[in-house]
Amino acid sequence: MASFYAMTVPEFLAELGLSGRDLFDLEWRLSDGEGALIVARTGLTVEAIQAMTFQEFTPDARMMITRKDGHHCPLCPDDVHRKSLASPWVFRCPVHGADLQDATGATLPEMLGDARMAALATHAKAGSVILDAWARGAGQGILGAPEMLAVLTARHRRASPPSLAEQPRMSLQTRRDYHEFLTMPILRQALTVVVPEYDLVAPVLAKPVRPGLYGLAQGSLLQGFALTVGIGRLVEDPVALAIAVLLASDTDGQGRVQDALRSWPLSLRRRISARLWRAKRDERDRRIAQTPTRRRQSHEYRRVQSHEYRSRIS
């Protein structure tokens, strides 16, 4: 609104009689008195003013509101910050239909590839619906967004340096120069098991995400998309994916994942425990079947002596 009146934000707030008020507090919720001041100076209705705020978001979801320096539409004016683009689970501009860009100007299709992006679209849409319902306090089904994010961001394996597949091609001298980078431990999280496509394209140093809700609220465009896809997949088959994460975990990682799963409903945890036991049993049987068996050596004494063989042959 400030740009519409050709004013800076501080000038506009002073004109409204709201000088000194925090801008983000006003965008979050307006009191009746603050709304009346804006209505008196702009001529808009109270309903129109309240529709510009995030009053429908729950307090826990306030941290999800992205600021001006977040992801942006390349076709929207620089001085326009749309409310519809302020959620980290929105990846296309609803006005222009363009893919959002990150701080470097890259889009998700450029980072993931068109084919991979199309394959992930269904789960990304399902995850966006779940997150939007959670932010507005609506029903979310059996699992809530915070519970799923806790599992996705759990460290399922100990930190380890980049593997050969994660390292770029470089000469021997370059490897010596970047020895510190090649030996730097990287956090390993369940997100890479649930969304292996993210593990393939994410820069190795930028793979780790912040724990829980902070991973979505403060993550990059690619990280937010991967977490949204992960939520869409967990909603579809939570038991199978939880087992996949546990089987891919090391001993300490299994404990951390189990801690994150404690917030899940008891019925789901019982199904996970039962199927995990069967999966471990089947894996153990498969390994035993693949192990080559040695020919058993007999320890019985020979009843025929060697000299008898020689006599018979002669």
Label the predicted regions.
Residues 1-314:
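Basic, alpha-helical nucleic-acid-binding regions used in initiation and control of genome expression
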